[in-house]
């Protein structure tokens, strides 16, 4: 009778250990996959992300918004010329050199406006290059290896049947948290790209104000916003990398129950921080 009881207990322990390891291995595989996937998604340029949407945005920008921006530039340049002519005692002390300065300034403004789309894409090319380089370093340093899981399995084998059953039930909760994390990452990554497309579609209008002394702040703030949303991808990647390192430390801590709830806590923290990356990026670049 004791032999049968021991056999049944060992069989149940092996079953529960297998279930717990399956849940946690699925988690670690998911974490590794997410770091790699996010590195790809946030490191993708608008042109490469979706060619159809990119083509539509470019056509709208160049055929609908650019003519309006041309009118804005005309008004801004004319207004600045009138101001320049009147500010020197109603032209009594006017310097002819100012006309050449105005002509040069206006020519630069026209050049910038006609190359608006290339300038905007250059911003995202720079951020994409940085994110791609960082993604390779981060992904390589946060992989959760099979050796780490073997250490965890060894600690599980020393536990009794009751704690193992409770741990298996708790580990099942991880699937729900990972599902929620996947939704948050999807919304954030895809929402960021849609924001990039929206910013790009109206780019000529703020760029038309860059050369003016008084309203040039609009164009400067627009450029800051572009850099902020571009490098937001870097902050997203860093958040996920920190999460992966923290999970890596939990898995190898030797405390399976603490690992389960630690992962849940870190997942909630990650979701919270991911939504703050946009605001942090704007503060870094002074955009508002």
Which sequence ranges carry the predicted segments?
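Membrane-water interface regions at transmembrane-helix termini and the short interhelical loops
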Residues: 81-94, 182-186, 214-215
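Gly/Ser-rich, low-complexity
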Residues: 1-72, 88-97, 107-177, 216, ...
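Alpha-helical transmembrane segments of helical membrane proteins, especially in multi-pass transport
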Residues: 174, 178-210, 224-246
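Hydrophobic alpha-helical transmembrane segments
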Residues: 67-79, 196
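Membrane-embedded alpha-helices of multi-pass transport/permease systems
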Residues: 75, 120, 127, 184-187, ...
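Elongated alpha-helical scaffolds
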Residues: 102-105
